[in-house]
UniProtKB/Swiss-Prot annotation:
Record keywords: Coiled coil, Viral release from host cell, Viral tail assembly
Protein name: Probable tape measure protein
Entry superkingdom: Viruses
Biological processes annotated in GO: viral tail assembly
Length: 729
């Protein structure tokens, strides 16, 4: 009947395996990050160059359209284009087209001084855009209003007009967002009653602060006053007479305009404020200011030309100050910086690259007929070229990459298979050696995985380079489409395909040589690892000398078996002769039986005790010898192992002793020794230390392995007992 035998096996290499797995994952993660960064950088560069070319072409076309719209000379058009570029680079507008639109408005309204440089023009453009931003309007309406202010005498120059508009908006004159329209519509009327821009803006601000609906209502009231008083008449004269003024003189002053008319307006408003009776005052106001006075009501009495300018406060420099305030922030400065870089690229392409390409235009046109012929050939054989291009794109390149990667994977599989077969032999020889074979196998497998991850990174770089080349080709094709004739593009593409087809054998041959060189290099590395494993590790030495070890072990067990057999035969012969001796001494049978039983029992006890001691000593001696030999090899490997594998960021840091020694199984120990039952722990033990194994402690844990045998334990016991009894020990 088969009986179970319990065996406790000690071994733990999880920590080393996890450490190496983490290192492999870090290498792989770095490869993915490097690939992502390289792809992002390559894409950004390609997009930037493509956008620069497109913008250079667009800017040149926009400048030509602007010059045609303004009728500017080539020199003037150049200065205007440079000014527009500077304005955009400084962070103004959403595009160069916006700058061109602002420039057109200023030019058409006469706001660009004759002979102004690009810098001067740029300064005017920037102010126009700043004022438009303050007013919440577009540059076009702002330029129109400023131009009208200059034509009607509201301002001496564009800078003064900009200051007046900005200061008026800051004082609330643009309450209903009609300030630009008001100056554009009523500028002539303001001039007719002797008002300049500052005074007119001050009156608008006073009326709005007094309760007027909007700037248009205040301006319309002033317009009606000028028309009514200039026409004169009995009602006008009577109204002035009620205020103690001469109507005829007032009519003459308003008709004269200028400062005299302004003074007449001032006296009229002062006279209205002196009338105590509200009914009489409103009736007089309606007579002189028309029905708008009914809408203005008391707001009309707030108008005072003599203090209007003071109401605005400081006007000069208002536009410049507002612009500096708007652009004194990080966002605007960053925008200006990036646009400056972009404009530099565009200027280089438009001013250097495109003119050089223009010089090649005649030569390219000379080969137009040849390109047309080639284009016809391609058209006739389009199917063939499509097949070749499809094979190159869809089959060949992926196949080459897959072949290279698969070769590396196959190499890794071969090594893993070899290590697995070696580990199997180690398992059958000794369980302790199996644990360390797994450690070594895990180490090598991690190294193979790191190599595969590195190969993936390289493949990513290759793919990134291919994608960058493809994007570059697309950009170049778009560039040529925008500048050159279509046959030239067709010829370039056809030429590329023809070159690939014509030199395909060379390309394939060189590619195979490169991959063959890589494969030979990989095989050399793994051959070196195989030699190292067989000659410098405990499991490797067991594998290499397995036949000798097995033969010696077999001879030893045969000797033990023969010895046990002879002993059992002696026991049998003794038992056969025992009855005769018992019958001849019947009188002392009982005492003799007792003595014989006692002798047998004591002999078995002593024999079993000696057998146990012998087995324990034998196991201990073998274990110490094996552990010492393997630990010696492990010390050599730990000494020879570097602290870091790889170069730079593609490196893996290794611990000082990556391969732990055999776990302490009891007995003398010294140096770094791995102990611990629930988890591996490395401790440094001084000479003369003794380790007591867990299985020797009460309640110690372990792994129970059930081993079945068909041998008869009672027969084995009888033979062992007889052998021990008759042995000389």
């Amino acid at each position: 009947m088969a009986r179970p035998i319990q065996i406790t096996i000690m071994g733990d290499a999880d920590q080393l395996s996890e450490t190496l797995d983490q290192a492999s994952e870090e290498v792989s993660a770095f490869g993915e990050q490097a690939k992502g960064l390289a792809l992002a950088a390559g894409g950004a560069i390609a997009v930037g160059i493509g956008a620069g070319i497109a913008e250079a072409l667009e800017r040149e076309a926009g400048n030509d359209v602007l010059a045609a719209q303004l009728g500017a000379t080539p020199a003037e058009a150049k200065r205007l284009g440079e000014a527009a570029g500077e304005v955009y680079s400084a962070g103004y507008g959403e595009s160069v087209a916006d700058a061109n639109e602002a420039l057109k408005g200023l030019w058409q309204q006469g706001l660009v001084p004759a002979g102004a440089t690009a810098d001067d023009n740029g300064e005017h453009f920037e102010k126009a855009m700043d004022v438009a931003t303050v007013l919440g309007d577009e540059v076009g309406p702002t330029s129109n209003a400023v131009g009208q202010m200059l034509k009607t005498g509201m301002a001496k120059n564009a800078d003064e007009a900009f200051d007046i508009l900005v200061r008026g908006a800051q004082e609330g004159a643009n309450k209903s967002e009609d300030l630009l329209d008001t100056f554009n519509e009523y500028g002539v009327q303001f001039k007719g009653i002797g008002l300049d821009g500052k005074t007119a803006m001050g009156l608008l601000s006073q009326g709005l602060q007094g309760g007027a609906r909007d700037a248009d209502l205040v301006a319309d009231s002033l317009k009606e006053f000028g028309l009514i008083v200039r026409a004169g008449g009995d009602e006008v004269n009577a109204a002035y007479k009620s205020m103690g003024l001469n109507g005829a003189e007032m009519t003459k002053a308003i008709a004269q305009g200028g400062p005299v008319a302004k003074d007449a307006l001032d006296k009229t408003l002062d006279g209205l404020r002196k009338i105590k009776d509200p009914a009489e005052r409103i009736a007089t106001a309606v007579t002189l200011f028309g029905t708008q006075a009914e809408d203005m009501q008391d707001a009309l009495l707030k108008l005072d030309p003599s203090s209007a300018v003071e109401t605005l406060g400081k006007v000069d420099g208002a536009a410049k100050s507002a612009g500096e305030t708007m652009h004194d922030n990080a966002a605007t400065k960053i925008k200006a910086f990036t646009r400056g870089l972009q404009t530099g690229l565009v200027d280089f392409i438009g001013g250097t690259v495109l003119p050089i390409l223009e010089k090649f235009k005649p030569a390219l046109e000379g080969i137009g007929s040849t390109m047309a012929t080639v284009g016809g050939f391609v058209s006739e054989h389009s199917t063939t070229f499509k097949v070749v291009a499809g094979i190159i794109t869809a089959v060949l390149l992926p196949a080459l990459i897959q072949w290279g990667v698969q070769s590396t994977i196959n190499a890794g599989k071969a090594v893993v298979a070899w290590v697995t077969s070696s580990a199997t032999a180690v398992i059958e020889s000794t369980k302790q050696a199996l644990a360390h074979a797994k450690v070594v196998a895990g180490w090598i497998a991690s190294g193979v995985q790191a190599g595969l991850n590195a190969a993936k990174v390289v493949a990513g770089w290759v793919l990134m380079g291919a994608q960058s080349m493809i994007q570059g080709a697309r950009m170049a094709a778009a560039w040529l489409l925008a500048m050159g004739p279509i046959p030239l593009i067709i010829a370039a593409i056809v030429g590329l395909v023809v070159l690939i087809v014509a030199n395909w054998d060379k390309i394939w041959a060189y590619t195979k040589k490169v991959f063959q060189w890589l494969w030979d290099w990989v095989k050399k590395i793994f051959n070196w690892l195989e030699d190292l494993f067989l000659n410098f590790t405990g499991p490797g030495l067991l594998i290499k000398h397995w036949d000798k070890s097995r033969s010696a072990t077999k001879n030893t067990f045969n000797n033990v078996k023969n010895f046990a057999k002879d002993a059992l035969n002696a026991v049998v012969n003794f038992v056969k002769g025992l009855p005769g001796r018992i019958l001849s001494a019947a009188s002392s049978l009982l005492s003799a039986g007792k003595r014989i039983g006692g002798y047998v029992i004591d002999g078995i006890k002593n024999g079993l005790s000696k057998l146990g001691g012998f087995a324990s000593s034998l196991a201990s001696a073998v274990g110490r010898a094996a552990k010492g030999a393997i630990n010696g090899v492990i010390d050599l490997l730990n000494w020879a192992t570097p602290n870091k594998l790889g170069w730079g960021k593609l490196s893996i840091d290794l611990p000082d002793n990556p391969i732990p020694k055999i776990r302490a199984m009891g007995g003398p120990a010294s140096g770094w020794t791995r102990v611990g039952e629930r988890g591996p722990e490395d401790v440094f033990l001084p000479n003369g230390s003794t380790v007591r194994p867990n299985h020797a402690l009460s309640g110690s844990g372990g792994v129970t392995v059930n081993v079945q045998t068909n041998a008869d334990p009672f027969a084995i016991g009888r033979e062992v007992a007889w052998a021990l009894r008759t042995s000389p020990a």
